[in-house]
Curated annotation (Swiss-Prot):
Gene (name only): uvrC
Major place of residence: cytoplasm
GO terms under cellular component: cytoplasm; excinuclease repair complex
UniProt subunit comment: Interacts with UvrB in an incision complex.
Species name: Legionella pneumophila subsp. pneumophila (strain Philadelphia 1 / ATCC 33152 / DSM 7513)
Coiled coil: none
A GO biological process held by the record: nucleotide-excision repair
Protein name per UniProt: UvrABC system protein C
Localisation per UniProt entry: Cytoplasm
Similarity comment: Belongs to the UvrC family.
Domain GIY-YIG as annotated: residue spans: 19-97
Boundaries of every UVR domain copy: 208-243
GO molecular function: DNA binding; excinuclease ABC activity
Keywords tagged on the record: Cytoplasm, DNA damage, DNA excision, DNA repair, Excision nuclease, SOS response
Function: The UvrABC repair system catalyzes the recognition and processing of DNA lesions. UvrC both incises the 5' and 3' sides of the lesion. The N-terminal half is responsible for the 3' incision and the C-terminal half is responsible for the 5' incision.
Length: 618
């Protein structure tokens, strides 16, 4: 044992540990989970933390805080890795490498419609719909660009099912040649299925297979004198070859994921390059948070690299076996590579190998990943040095003793009192935290009363934050002295004291750079120079709160107006309104619909259909 004085209970616990696979949770004196780990042999692994040979800075810092340890025995290492991954996502322990939630990374979803599947962007924590998923992609823009490419080449529909069912003529997507109008049966289910299969192969990187099949189908069309279909197939081949030329970084056979990692104090960068059929299909960067440690000690640097790699394996591959490739290539030796190969192969149902520092042609894949890794790290450091300098400037401006770790900002949006919505956005030292943004539908107030709206939103928000003990260091209100005073009163009534409250009003000209800051704690108002870093940070969070509020307000206003428009028609209640909207996809399409189409909606009589039609055609 090292020089740490273990309690008698903990020392006894270490001797009684089983020599079986499982996971362990290390807790501090308050019962907070500090670290979650997995082990093939719980007894050996947990005891190793308390060995004299374990001199890593991070390990010593962790061990000094451990008051108790909990274990869960599993049937296999695979089960242990899955459980570890799920617990890290749920508990987010201080000393684990933490990757961002899956919601941050969007997917492409192909629905399981029996005849005409839909392609769409999918990103949600909710239970995913059935169908095929591809991704994750580095961002929404990458998904949208890929979807547009698929629409141009394969003409897969992207409209909602309710809209699809309601069509009586082709929409604009057909006019611009991005859809074959399956809604009005301009294409048979059999031919549409061929397009969907080609789109799936395209997303899997199997371009050459598609090209061969398209060429064969084009020959058949020509031999049958079907020159129109042959021309369509010719254009598909041309577009695919163009993409193949743009996409191919290294033209080699095989499927692989190339993972390059760089660990720095406080963060790591993981560059994952997806290669299918010898072509680079995707390259994306992940930035997990890693525990701070002194990285000039070789042991700590290597240990954090290993943890980062294992955390990524759990995060990226274990939720879906379809993502596991034949080969994973990485740029540093892995202590448990054989164990990870076994786990991934079991999960996949066939072999998955891990290759370290490849030679020959595959080394070019690694070179590509490492080059992208360096660029990603440089961009991240540049961006976050700007963020840190802005946080430091705000700390100095507010004369705070401690660093600002978390800020929240509230804004109110409405149109002359209609559809009032409050927004709350969250920033931490990494910048915006969109997954923690919240909207509040404001009810029961006098329309247009911003003070009452702000009071309701802040009260609801802080009652919850007090329960979960997650209070911000700085609270920003997009408003003047009156709104800030209301918020101060709310915080006082809830017993919240240790928060810096700051108002940001637009000033007399309402121009950026002329904002007046209201510091309630010191009862003073002031204007910052336009080049102030603190002002830039406040403008950023204020603008984000405003954007989020106005987006929510517009959605609510549109929904309210649709409901009020339909319910003003005698005989149309909530159920019939829903049936109409599901059938036609929206108010605009309903307004254009002929009388005979409205009659087809379930629950709508001919007399009521006539009344609805006349409402839109007075």
């Amino acid at each position: 044992m090292n020089d740490l004085q273990l309690s008698a209970e903990l020392a006894l616990f270490l001797t009684k540990l089983p020599s079986e696979p499982g996971i362990y949770r290390m807790l501090d004196e308050e019962g907070t989970v500090l670290y979650v780990g997995k082990a093939a042999n719980l007894k050996k692994r947990v005891n190793s933390y308390f060995s004299k040979q374990n001199t890593g800075v991070k390990t010593r810092a962790l061990v000094s805080q451990i008051k108790s340890i909990e274990i869960s025995v599993t049937r296999s290492e695979t089960e242990a890795l899955l459980l570890e991954s799920n617990l890290i996502k749920a508990l987010r322990p201080k000393y684990n490498v933490l990757l961002r939630d899956d919601k941050s990374y969007p997917y492409i979803h192909l629905s399981n419609h029996p005849d005409f599947p839909r392609i769409e962007l999918y990103r949600s924590k909710k239970k995913p719909p059935s169908g095929n998923f591809f991704g994750p992609y580095p961002g929404v823009a990458a998904v949208r660009e890929t979807i547009v490419t698929i629409q141009k080449i394969f003409k897969i529909r992207n409209c909602r099912d309710s809209y699809f069912k309601a069509r009586s003529r082709p929409c604009l997507q057909y006019q611009i040649k991005r859809c074959t109008a399956p809604c009005v049966h301009y294409i048979s289910p059999e031919n549409y299925k061929l397009s969907v299969e080609d789109a799936i192969r395209f997303l899997q990187g199997k371009c050459q297979i598609i090209l061969d099949e398209l060429a064969e189908r084009m020959k058949q069309a020509v031999s049958q004198l079907n020159f129109e279909e042959a021309a369509v197939l010719r254009d598909q081949i041309k577009n695919l070859r163009l993409i193949q030329e743009q996409q191919g970084v290294v033209q080699l056979r095989g499927d692989a994921d190339v993972i390059a990692i760089e660990v720095r104090p406080g963060f790591a960068c993981i560059q994952c390059v997806t290669i299918r059929e010898g072509q680079v299909l995707n390259s994306q960067s992940f930035f997990p948070t890693v525990p701070y440690a002194v990285l000039d000690e070789e042991l700590d640097a290597n240990s954090l690299w290993q943890q980062t790699f294992e955390a990524f394996i759990g995060f990226y591959y274990l939720d879906t076996s379809e993502r596991i490739p034949d080969l994973i290539i990485t740029n540093q030796s892995i202590t448990e590579s054989r164990s990870l190969e076994y786990i991934l192969s079991q999960r996949r149902g066939k072999s998955c190998k891990i290759q370290i520092n490849p030679r020959g042609v595959k080394s070019r894949w690694m070179d590509f990943a490492v080059n992208n890794l360096r660029i990603s790290v440089a961009e991240y450091v540049s961006k976050h040095s700007t963020i840190r300098s802005r946080y430091q400037a705000l700390k100095q401006l507010l004369a705070l003793d401690k660093n600002i770790e978390r800020m929240e900002c509230f804004d109110i949006s409405h149109t002359q009192g209609e559809a009032t919505v409050a927004s709350c956005v969250v920033f931490d030292t990494e910048g915006p935290r969109p997954s923690e943004y919240r909207r509040f539908n404001i009810e029961g107030i006098t329309p247009g009363d911003d003070y009452a709206a702000m009071e309701q939103a802040v009260t609801r928000r802080f009652k919850r934050l007090i329960d979960v003990q997650l209070l911000p260091d700085v609270l920003i209100i997009d408003g003047g002295k009156g709104q800030v005073s209301i918020v101060k009163r709310v915080l006082t009534s809830l017993g919240v004291e240790d928060i810096t409250l700051l108002g940001v009003s637009k000033g007399p000209s309402r121009k950026a750079g002329w904002e007046k800051l209201i510091l309630v704690n010191e009862n003073r108002e002031f204007v910052l120079p336009e080049d102030s870093k603190a002002l830039h940070l406040l403008q950023h969070i204020r603008d984000e709160a405003h954007r989020f509020a106005i987006t929510a307000h517009r959605k609510k206003r549109q929904k309210t107006r649709v409901e009020s428009t339909l319910e003003s028609i005698e005989g149309v209640g909530a159920k019939r309104r829903q049936a109409l909207l599901q059938r036609f996809g929206g108010l605009r399409e309903l307004a254009k619909a002929p009388l005979e189409e409205i009659c087809k909606v379930q629950g709508i009589s001919e007399q009521l259909a006539k009344r609805i039609y006349e409402h839109f055609h007075p």
